[in-house]
Every structure is written in structure tokens, then in C-alpha cells.
A protein has these predicted regions:
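Acidic, Ser/Pro/Thr-rich low-complexity regulatory regions
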Residues: 1-175
């Protein structure tokens, strides 16, 4: 596994932790895996992260590690959110997430990202699907569409080139 892909995993874990969507253990597990595979090199912060407990210990160490290897090239928050949406889609299909749990996540994510255009219909249809059965299918279509684009995209620019707001608008209305 390449170092940048490994850092992406850590950045995803940090993003989810900062948003309150995941426990600190995911960052710790990342560091433990680096140790297990003897990939920490001489990086004492990775060793310290592997033994860290709680958000107050984990976040500063994870931030130092990401800063050291990425510098100013940190991943965009929308990109991290998009990759999280892709993870959520898989969890939804596996029955580990529900429309209700997704609504709670999207309700926090949408304003935290400053209301991105690509999240409008997904957030709206998820909220509506809670109470109006006719919105279940439009929600699932949009969820599949957005998640599949983020699964393919290597960055926000690539996603934006693929994303079609008109398509989102068309499939966002019950038939």
C-alpha cells in the first residue's frame, strides 16, 4: 500500500472523528496497522498514535502525521465527505445504516461543508424519505449516483467534472 493511500485512510478517519461520526479508535487502528506492517519508519508520532486514547490525544498526533507527509496538500473536506458518502452507501446496502441514521449524518454534514451543490438533493430526499414513502426511491437513486461518482473521483475537481446537477434534479422527484 502506498504512503499517500495510507494517509488518505488516516485523513478520512480524522475527518469522521472531527465531525463526530467515528470513534478515535479508527485513527489508532491505522497507526497500529502501520506498526504491524513495520511501515512506521522512524516516525515516533505513529508509535505514539498507536497507543493514544481519546480524541484529545488522537487528533493532535494524527494532525502532526498528516501535516508532516502532506504539508499544504491536505485533502479537501468535500473530498473526504464524498468518500465518507461512498462508505455510507455500502453500509446502507449492508443494512448497517438506515434512512434515519443517514438523515442525522447528512443534517450535520451539509452545513459543515457550507451547503455544497452536490449534496442538496441527497440531503433533501433523505429527510423527506423519513416521512414520505414516495421519496424512498428518489433518495436511493441520488444516493447511488452521488456515491458512485465519489467512488470514481480522485479529487473534488474530478467529481465536479462528472457531476450533473440536472440529473440530480430530475431523479430527485417522485414518479
Amino acid at each position: 500500500m502506498k504512503i499517500m493511500q495510507q494517509l488518505t485512510e488516516l485523513e478520512l478517519a480524522v475527518f469522521q472523528l472531527q465531525m463526530g461520526f467515528a470513534p478515535a479508535d479508527r485513527c489508532v487502528d491505522w497507526a497500529v496497522e502501520r506498526l504491524r506492517l513495520d511501515q512506521e519508519g522512524e516516525d515516533l508520532d505513529i508509535v505514539l498514535l498507536a497507543s493514544a486514547r481519546g480524541v484529545d490525544e488522537v487528533l493532535p498526533l494524527a494532525d502532526v502525521i498528516i501535516e508532516r507527509y502532506r504539508g499544504a496538500q491536505r485533502l479537501d473536506q468535500q473530498f473526504l465527505a464524498g468518500k465518507y458518502i461512498d462508505e455510507l452507501r455500502a453500509a446502507y446496502l449492508a443494512g448497517r445504516e438506515s434512512v434515519s441514521s443517514l438523515d442525522a449524518i447528512l443534517t450535520r454534514l451539509y452545513p459543515a461543508l457550507d451547503y455544497p451543490d452536490w449534496l442538496v438533493m441527497l440531503s433533501r430526499n433523505c429527510e423527506y424519505a423519513l416521512d414520505v414513502p414516495d421519496f424512498q426511491q428518489p433518495f436511493e437513486l441520488e444516493f447511488d449516483y452521488i456515491a458512485s461518482l465519489w467512488a470514481e473521483a480522485g479529487d473534488v475537481g474530478a467529481f465536479e467534472r462528472l457531476y450533473d446537477r440536472e440529473r440530480s434534479d430530475r431523479q430527485g422527484v417522485p414518479c
